[in-house]
Amino acid sequence: MRRINTIMQGKTNGGNGPESGTVVVTRTQPKTRKPSLYRVLLLNDDYTPMEFVVHVLQRFFQKNLDDATRIMLHVHNHGVGECGVFTYEVAETKVSQVMDFARQNQHPLQCVMEKK
């Protein structure tokens, strides 16, 4: 936070008593930072079906069929692919949802997050 001091001179209550003189008013201005962003990544494996990966991308990352297919092929060909960029809490939730869903469907799909 940044502090700003404002000095005001004058008389209060119109007299020469203890109420007259200089008044210092301190105001603080909050300094906000943008939150750190995290990439959510899918990792390739030899067992998870491509259709399941596309379904995950559509369900948890709201990707259309073309984008989901493109990302899935990138994961397949390069070993890793980015699903999206989110704040820490959102990225953590997405990773957890994907991992739970993969386990429920008995697939070894791995999803991780890394700071951008």
UniProtKB/Swiss-Prot annotation:
- Mind telling me which InterPro entries this protein's record contains? ClpS (IPR022935), ClpS_core (IPR003769), Ribosomal_bL12_C/ClpS-like (IPR014719)
Q: Region annotation Disordered: residue ranges?
A: 1-23
Q: Where is the composition biased (Polar residues)?
A: 1-11
**SUBUNIT field:** Binds to the N-terminal domain of the chaperone ClpA.
GO:BP terms for this protein?
A: protein catabolic process; proteolysis
The UniProt entry's sequence similarity note says:
Belongs to the ClpS family.
Q: What does this protein do?
A: Involved in the modulation of the specificity of the ClpAP-mediated ATP-dependent protein degradation.
Q: What is this protein called?
A: ATP-dependent Clp protease adapter protein ClpS
